[in-house]
Amino acid sequence: MDLIKVVEQRFADLTQKAYPHFKSGDTITVAYRIKEGNKERIQQYRGVVIKMAGHGSSKRFTVRKMSENIGVERIFPINSPFIDNIVLNKIGKVRRSKLYYLRKLIGKKSRIKEKRI
């Protein structure tokens, strides 16, 4: 058996938190811990997941939000110790796994349909 895979699996078991299952197109809120000097605060980052990449302990996801008509994207590692929690707000209905086309759309065209449950 590959030694690197064994180490990654043990590391993932130690650092893995229970987050809800989400995919591209879902709207999530990430509570991210930010340290400024000797103070620490939690910032809520709400947006649409446009990409899931990697696997295992190196898995990461990209969240896009609109801030005053400017698109802001942020990449979060799934096993980051700075992520406090992740809340799934909406389940999106999309046919692609990478939603790069949202970068070109403006206004109501950039909305994603919500999946009915």
UniProtKB/Swiss-Prot annotation:
Pfam families: Ribosomal_L19. The keyword DNA-binding does not apply. One of its GO terms (cellular component) is cytosolic large ribosomal subunit. GO terms for biological process: translation. InterPro entries: Ribosomal_bL19, Ribosomal_bL19_CS, Ribosomal_bL19_sf, Translation_prot_SH3-like_sf. It comes from the Bacteria. GO terms for molecular function: structural constituent of ribosome. Keywords: Ribonucleoprotein, Ribosomal protein. This protein is located at the 30S-50S ribosomal subunit interface and may play a role in the structure and function of the aminoacyl-tRNA binding site. Belongs to the bacterial ribosomal protein bL19 family. This is Large ribosomal subunit protein bL19. It comes from Azobacteroides pseudotrichonymphae genomovar. CFP2. The lineage of its organism: Bacteria, Pseudomonadati, Bacteroidota, Bacteroidia, Bacteroidales. The gene is rplS.
